[in-house]
A protein has these predicted regions:
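Conserved N-terminal beta1-alpha1 strand-loop-helix module at the mouth
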Residues: 1-204
Length: 204
């Protein structure tokens, strides 16, 4: 399964986290976020895929960040349209959706065959990083073909919940606020312990 850690900014923290063998690392380029990345860190990850998170940014702004930060994947976390997402090809694109109930899953249909991945997050007061989970059983109603990552308040005590969750399209999890010492500063030890406990038993 894919392990994505989002909301990274500190160079030393990035370097330490990369050593854990995670797969994707996210950086947030939305100025209203407490994890906003305003300048290129002194160290950028080299052995993981770099994910840039954008919220209703312009096409020009996204392309500039992709080039400046050498991003591998673009995550759209706002109200971006299917046409906007399609215009970002050939880059890989994640479209995030805030989920509270089955009705919220209907919005995914317009993006099928356009984006590469979905990310299902908790519907909260702010965009991402709320630290709250939604009812994952809602995702039983998702019958799309696009693979997705499970997000929203996954924390150190959720190993069993992650193990127990099964969906044929779920390919990974997204970790953020509940593993933080401060905004954009991850507790690498707790992430290591979580991954050790999770081990490779999920989806075997």
């Amino acid at each position: 399964m894919i392990i994505k850690v989002c909301g990274m900014r500190d160079a030393d923290n990035i370097q330490e986290l990369e050593k854990l063998g995670i797969d994707w690392m996210g950086m947030i380029f939305w100025s209203r976020s407490s994890r906003y990345v305003a300048e290129i860190p002194a160290y950028m990850p080299e052995r993981v895929k770099r994910v840039g998170v954008f919220v209703d940014a312009s096409m020009e702004d996204i392309r500039q960040h992709v080039n400046d930060y050498q991003l591998d994947i673009i995550q759209l976390h706002g109200r971006e349209t299917p046409a906007f997402a399609e215009a970002l090809k050939p880059w890989s694109v994640i479209k995030a959706f805030n989920i509270a109930n089955e009705v919220d899953l209907n919005q995914t249909k317009a993006y099928e065959g356009i984006v590469d991945f979905f990310l299902f997050d908790t519907k909260g007061k702010v965009v991402g990083g709320n630290g709250e989970k939604f009812d994952w059983s809602v995702l039983e109603a998702y019958q799309g073909s696009t693979p997705f990552l499970l997000s929203g308040g996954i924390g150190p005590d959720d190993v069993e919940a992650v193990r127990a969750f099964h969906h044929p399209r779920c390919i990974g999890i997204d970790l953020n606020s509940r593993f933080e010492l401060a905004p954009a500063l991850k507790d690498v030890t707790r992430i290591q312990e979580f991954l050790n406990e999770l081990n490779h038993e999920v989806y075997e």
